[in-house]
Amino acid sequence: MEQKNFDPDGVGVDNGTYFGLPFAPETAELVLISAPWDVTVSYGAGAAYAPDAIIEASTQLDFYDPLAPGAWRRGIATADVDYSLLESSQRLRVDASRVIDHLEGGGCLEDDYVVRKVRRVNEGCVAMNANIEAQAARWLCLLYTSPS
């Protein structure tokens, strides 16, 4: 959808972007990056599914802001969700849950069984952070090297 056809006061368009905004990341001033990750939550998993749920629900939001009327025109885009992060999150969540259960049952963090799982979870978290950092660097580089 082109910006000229976008009506912020109309029915939200389900186009796979946050708020149904019509901007491509390559031309936006702000790119929203999703992190489908909930490996280390201690009470109930599910946050990893939030990016898709928020994208879907966000088309129902109104854009009126008396302090920044028309701010959406500046260009807010949605980067593609990297679903490999969700897959890693689901896989590592099993290890994290076992560690949490072990500790809640009075187990020790130094047990060999737990140390291996914690190491895998920590390595996965480092990889996830690196992924998000690389995505941000990509969009920042594009933003600051593309002609205005």
Tell where the protein language model's regions lie, with residue ranges:
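N-terminal small/polar loop signature for handling phosphorylated ligands or for N-terminal nucleophile
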Residues: 137
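N-terminal glycine-rich anion-binding loop in soluble enzyme alpha/beta folds
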Residues: 2-121
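Glycine-rich anion/phosphate-binding loops
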Residues: 129-130
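Conserved small/polar residues in nucleotide/adenosyl-binding loops
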Residues: 144-148
